[in-house]
Regions:
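Extended, charge-rich alpha-helical interface modules
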Residues: 2-78
Length: 78
């Protein structure tokens, strides 16, 4: 696999997990700051735990990728 392809795959993975992190944060923000959103779920604690786990998993994946593979040259923006 070429260096360019490797960089693109790395960038795609980071972007994927950042999107998952953003989604989880957005959902948790709604639950924490909007009582209307909370009223729709009878089991709010399980929902909060589910989204907290998704947030933690995404952050862990990003950290793991950066720790193990960030020594690659920076990916050009564009």
């Amino acid at each position: 696999m070429s260096s360019g392809s490797t960089k693109l795959l790395y960038k795609a993975l980071i972007s994927h997990y950042k999107a998952q992190k953003d989604e989880a944060r957005a959902v948790l923000e709604v639950y924490f700051n909007n009582s209307v959103g909370i009223g729709e779920h009878s089991d709010i604690m399980n929902e909060l735990k589910k989204w907290t786990s998704k947030l933690a998993e995404a952050e862990e994946a990003i950290d793991s990728l950066k720790k193990n593979f960030q020594q690659a040259p920076p990916i050009p923006k564009g």
